[in-house]
């Protein structure tokens, strides 16, 4: 007996008398409908100004922006793959209005409008705030490394650049000398030719030398900006493909990357501030982060939490006068050992010393004073104890580690009072409870961004990569808004997002 499987609908092999709407095949609650409603509200006037009335009509910037945002939300980043989806995927067809922009159009728009994508991110954050999805009550800041569009194998150290530049210069001079000699000796025999054909070889070497010089000059400028007047270490490297990317470590691996910084609101994990940094660590990222939050939302948060990577004098100083209740975790070396000094043989660390701001000195566990010995124009300070007091102290073996027998020395800077206050604040149980929020606020967001497939940049150069990072952050916010609408947390009223009334 033949099993009666389901048959294909008759419309599959026969044309219907009346055309049907192909989008009826999509579920009524498909996310592309919500994205389309949101995209209609995007302000693209700043990009529209760059188009001309002459020539062939261009795709509207709002359409291209919508396609890119929707594509990133679906984990599609290749411009060729996006074009393909516009031909094959119903959701993409709806977002693109049955248009299929060439991959070059998509790629060039993404490459040439990095400033607009920052504005696009701002609109996503404000839209979320208007929908009641972010309140700036508690914001957490964190950073993560994103791979640059280059390779460690397309790089060279400063020492090798200098050596290679000299070698190529010598080789080119040698080739030119040989060519001139051949011209003189064989001009009559070969007439228009030298008889010793080398132009192509010379051309290749000259191109290589130009690239070497360009990379060397870029590295010298970078190091001069970072360390004015200091000699450049021969081990410093630069990438030929993306000269603005930096070698950064992540879980024991090193690669050319950028440091993506995001400030995330507690309410619904909306990103309210973002920027891309070339710094490998987070020691100086608070000031630009606060500026971005202010520029994006027009205000600053009531509370902020940051991990111990931000525990630096410069970062803490950035909060001065901002009226933000800040919680910064102390580093492993800055946490007090709970074991009593008297009842254990543990080493005495810097954190065991109390700083007296009024007298500008440190007091050791034995009650001796470490006075200020030297101070530089950059704010670096060195405090040192009295040698006779240290020699007679019963803690000396656990405290003084100098092989020369010098008294206990503490190296710090003029920001020490700020660090001490933060350490004391973070020892309180109430502070620890507030800080616990951080793990649930910002860390999952990086996971969500990377789970879509965005782990590195398609564009090169800090400005263009910053634009792509802004786009990725805007996509995250739009995904949250769409999820909120589909989940009933927010609704559309009169074409605008508004909180759902419960």
Language-model features and meaning:
Residues 27-69:
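Basic, short loop/linker segments at the boundary and entry of helix-turn-helix/winged-helix-like folds
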Residues 3-5, 51-55, 430-433:
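A ubiquitous short alpha-helical element
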Residues 68, 75-88, 99-502:
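Anion-binding and metal-coordination hotspots
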Residues 1-32:
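Hydrophobic alpha-helical membrane-insertion signals
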């Amino acid at each position: 007996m033949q099993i009666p499987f389901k048959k294909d609908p008759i419309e599959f092999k026969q044309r219907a008398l009346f055309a049907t709407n192909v989008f009826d095949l999509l579920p009524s609650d498909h996310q592309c409908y919500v994205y389309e409603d949101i995209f209609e509200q995007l302000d693209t006037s700043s990009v529209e100004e760059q188009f001309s009335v002459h020539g062939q009509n261009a795709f509207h910037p709002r359409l291209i922006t919508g396609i890119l945002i929707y594509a990133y939300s679906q984990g599609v980043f290749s411009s060729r793959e996006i074009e393909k989806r516009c031909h094959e995927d119903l959701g993409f067809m709806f977002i693109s209005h049955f248009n299929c922009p060439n991959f070059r159009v998509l790629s060039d728009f993404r490459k040439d409008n990095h400033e607009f994508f920052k504005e696009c991110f701002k609109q996503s954050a404000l839209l979320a705030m208007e929908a009641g999805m972010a309140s700036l009550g508690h914001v957490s800041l964190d950073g993560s490394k994103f791979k640059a569009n280059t390779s460690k194998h397309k790089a060279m150290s400063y020492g090798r650049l200098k050596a290679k530049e000299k070698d190529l210069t010598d080789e080119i001079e040698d080739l030119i000398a040989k060519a001139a000699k051949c011209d003189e000796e064989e001009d009559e025999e070969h007439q228009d030719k030298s008889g010793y054909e080398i132009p192509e070889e010379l051309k290749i070497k000259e191109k290589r030398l130009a690239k070497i010089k360009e990379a060397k000059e870029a590295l010298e400028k970078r190091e001069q900006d970072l360390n004015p007047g200091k000699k450049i270490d021969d081990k410093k490297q630069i990438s030929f493909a993306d000269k603005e990317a930096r070698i950064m470590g992540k879980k024991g691996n090193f690669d050319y990357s950028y440091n993506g910084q995001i400030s995330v609101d507690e309410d619904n994990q909306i990103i309210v501030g973002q920027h891309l940094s070339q710094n490998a660590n987070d020691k100086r990222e608070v000031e630009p982060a606060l500026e971005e939050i202010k520029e994006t939302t027009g205000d600053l948060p009531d509370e902020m939490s940051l991990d111990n990577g931000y525990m630096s004098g410069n970062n803490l100083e950035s909060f001065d006068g901002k009226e933000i209740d800040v919680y910064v975790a102390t580093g492993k070396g800055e946490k007090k050992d709970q074991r009593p000094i008297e009842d254990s043989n543990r080493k005495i660390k810097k954190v065991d010393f109390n700083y007296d701001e009024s007298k500008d000195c440190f007091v050791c566990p034995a009650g001796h004073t470490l006075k200020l010995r030297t101070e530089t124009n950059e704010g670096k300070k060195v405090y040192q104890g009295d040698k006779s007091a240290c020699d007679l102290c019963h803690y000396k073996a656990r405290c003084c580690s100098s092989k020369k027998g010098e008294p206990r020395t503490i190296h710090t800077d003029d920001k020490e009072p700020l660090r001490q206050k933060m350490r004391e604040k973070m020892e309180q149980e109430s502070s620890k409870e507030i800080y616990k929020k951080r793990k649930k606020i910002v860390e999952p967001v990086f996971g969500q961004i990377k789970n879509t497939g965005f782990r590195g940049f398609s564009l090169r150069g800090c400005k263009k990569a910053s634009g792509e990072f802004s786009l990725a952050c805007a996509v995250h916010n739009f995904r949250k808004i769409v999820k909120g609408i589909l989940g009933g947390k927010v609704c559309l009223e009169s074409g605008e997002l508004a909180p759902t009334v419960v």
